[in-house]
Amino acid sequence: MTMYVKSNTTGKDMLSLLEWNKEELIDIIKLAVAMKTNPAHYSHILSGKILGMIFDKPSTRTRVSFEAGILQLGGQAIVMSSKELQIGRGEPIKDTAHVMSEYIDAIMIRTFSHEKVEELAYHAEIPIINGLTDLHHPCQALADLMTIYEWKDQLEGVKLAYIGDGNNVCHSLLLAGAMVGLDIRLAMPKGYEVDETILATAENLAKESGAKIFVTEDPKHAVTDADFIYTDVWTSMGQEEENAKRLADFGEKYQVNAELASIAKPDYHFLHCLPAHREEEVTAEIIDGNHSVIYQQAGNRLHAQKALLAAILEAK
C-alpha cells in the first residue's frame, strides 16, 4: 500500500475535524494540491472501492464533488436518501451501519442531526464522512484551508475574517483555523454566536498551534487588514421560517460590501461556501468582483475530498 499522508489514517472518520491532528490536516491539504496539479497520477488509487452517499438535505457541491471525486480515483459511488433506505422506515441506525459495512468501503452522509452521524460512526466498521450536519461542515473547511494555502503558500498567521451567522460552516472553519494557526476574527450579532463548547475547544487548540481567535459584534474590527473575508447565508436550510427576523437582525451592518471590504488588505480575497444570496450577506459587486475566489474555493471541494478519500481508504 502506498501512504498518501505521513501517518496511517486508513479507516479514520471525518465527523468534525477533531478526529484529526494538525499534521494530518496539512498532509491532506498538500495531497489535495498535488492531486489538483496531476490528477492522472492518482486515477486508479481507489480502484474497486465503493463510497455510499446518504442525503437527507439537498446538495449540489457535496454530491457532485464526492461522486466525481471517487470516480476520478478509480472507485464507484452509490447515492441514496434515507427515504430510500429502511432507516427511513424506522430501522435502527445500528443495524444500518453494520449492514452497510458488509457491502461498501465508506459512507458519506449529509443530514440534519450531528448525533445521527456520530451514532452511525460508532456502529460502523467502515469510515464515516460528515458531508454536513447542523453543527459541522468539515469537508468545506478542508476546501477553505486548501484555497487559503494556494494563495498564501502557508496557513500560520493568515488573517481570516468571518462575518455572519455562527453556523455549521463557521464552526468547522473556526476549528480548522485553530488547528493550523490562522488568525481568525469572527463578527456576528448577539443571538447568532458560535456554539460555546466549540469556541472553547477552538481556543484550546489555538494555544497549541499559535492561532489567534477574536470575537466581536463589529464587522469592521474583524475585517481590518484581513487577508480573507468569508461569509455565508444568514438563513440556513431548515431555518426558512426565521428568514424575516434574520434579515432584520443582520441587516446592512453585517453585509460584505465595498465599504466594509475597503478596510481589508488591498489584495484580500473573498470566500463564500455557496449557495449565496446576492444583496443579502454579500453584494454582487463583491462576490462577482476581482477579489472573489468562490469558484476556486468550490472547485477545491473536489480535490480536498479526493485527498480525504485517499487518506481514509486503503489507497493503492
UniProtKB/Swiss-Prot annotation:
Q: State the UniProt keywords alphabetically.
A: Amino-acid biosynthesis, Arginine biosynthesis, Cytoplasm, Transferase
**Could you tell me which InterPro entries the record lists for this protein?**
Asp/Orn_carbamoyltranf_P-bd, Asp/Orn_carbamoylTrfase, Asp/Orn_carbamoylTrfase_sf, Asp_carbamoyltransf_Asp/Orn-bd, Orn/put_carbamltrans, OTCase_ArgI
Q: Name one GO cellular component term.
A: cytoplasm
* Pathway connected to this protein: Amino-acid biosynthesis; L-arginine biosynthesis; L-arginine from L-ornithine and carbamoyl phosphate: step 1/3
Q: What PROSITE patterns would the database entry show?
A: CARBAMOYLTRANSFERASE (PS00097)
An example Gene Ontology molecular-function term: amino acid binding
- Its top-level enzyme class, in one word, is transferase
The entry sums up its family as follows: Belongs to the aspartate/ornithine carbamoyltransferase superfamily. OTCase family.
| Functional description taken from the UniProt entry | Reversibly catalyzes the transfer of the carbamoyl group from carbamoyl phosphate (CP) to the N(epsilon) atom of ornithine (ORN) to produce L-citrulline.
What protein does this entry describe?
Answer: Ornithine carbamoyltransferase
**What organism is recorded for this protein?**
Listeria innocua serovar 6a (strain ATCC BAA-680 / CLIP 11262)
